[in-house]
């Protein structure tokens, strides 16, 4: 499928769950800011040029920010607006590479934000399979991301039985 800007839509569990949760949160909090900035963590390993060797053990996580007008989020097609914005952001990773403009990141971060912007983050992924972890005392019965309780961040993970997403 293609979005309004002819962007190929990225219809993953992560994108759809995050879009729905963001719209619900903005409505529930009755956000008054003109814009909402959604910050997402991105695993950069697959986008690096040259590619990392298969023996690489570690991570390479960066961020991607998506800015959406609050009035569009509150509209009838709010979820679609977020899906299109996230899809477009992911497409720029494919087209431009993850390190494009790295020398300007800090100034873009601090100069690009408007004080009135509502900033919300997203952490985790349903692909991490947190309920499959076993450190020797059995699989977890409940997983909670406690480190984000004081920030405006969502946590997404797979559900305990693997057939859904916990937000």
Residue ranges and their predicted role:
Residues 1-167:
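Acyl-CoA-dependent O-acyltransferases
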